[in-house]
Amino acid sequence: MQFGIGLPNLSYVDPTQTLLSLAQVAQELRFDSIWVSDHVFIPFELAPNYPYSATGQLGLSATDHILDPLTTLSFLAGRVDGPRLGISVLIIPYRNPIVTAKMLVTLDVLSGGRVILGAGTGWMPEEFAALQASYADRGRVTDEYLDIFKELCTAEKPTFDGQHYQISNLGFYPKPIQKPHPPIWVGGYSKAALRRAARVGDGWHPSNIDPATLADKVNVLHGLCAEAGRDPARLEISTRVNNVAFGDSGDTVGRPAPLSGTAQNIIDTIRRYEDAGVSHIVLGIRGREPEEMIRTIRRFVDEVRP
């Protein structure tokens, strides 16, 4: 089992030193990856539509510090040279696909081939409206933009003729260090997300999903891979688990966090994830201050991680 640390680039704490301290601790303790999340802003008035909590509440406010994920990873890539650099997840329809591909490939080149592209469609209508992106078309746009990303990374003369975007007559260099492209880990666990992972993903990366539900979804994913003519064994299964906490439920979104309680409880849950096919867990550490989060990380290493 590999482990990553989710960094609070969407947070109420002072971001710069917190992100750097946590990334350096992740490197010191030999975590496999560090991860950031994606929003451009949080509205002052937000409907309770967050799909990964029982209440629909996001748990962030409009005045929290919201840092761009790609810029943040570029900053951290120059400070830590061990862990892979993941986005959990980049909301694909928010940004121009060519510019996004250029930023991702640049980061992959400058970091020595460490990028993991977690890819999602987004869920917040208010954010789509402000960015003048189509919420209704977000799934189809995501599919096209991911195809464009792969085309730009691999083709000598990239071309694409889609419903929402077309490219031709352009050179796209350099190509990424990772071949054929940085791995795409598709987020979400709706049927559409699973179908997307089966079609275009190098991995599947749902968030805040319990082991039993994940195991059921893996069975569905394997069937969809067979329909798409792909070997399901070639897809890496990962999951992000937020609010990792010792000694309590970790409950901040209306239901207990899967990785909470005693060290033995957490170990047992990790084993259930592993039995379901998970090979990489991203830990979202609960805490209001960096020192508190670092204590939890160190305790996880001492008492839980093999």
Predicted regions located by residue number:
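Active-site-adjacent structural elements that line small-molecule/cofactor binding pockets in enzymes
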Residues: 1-306
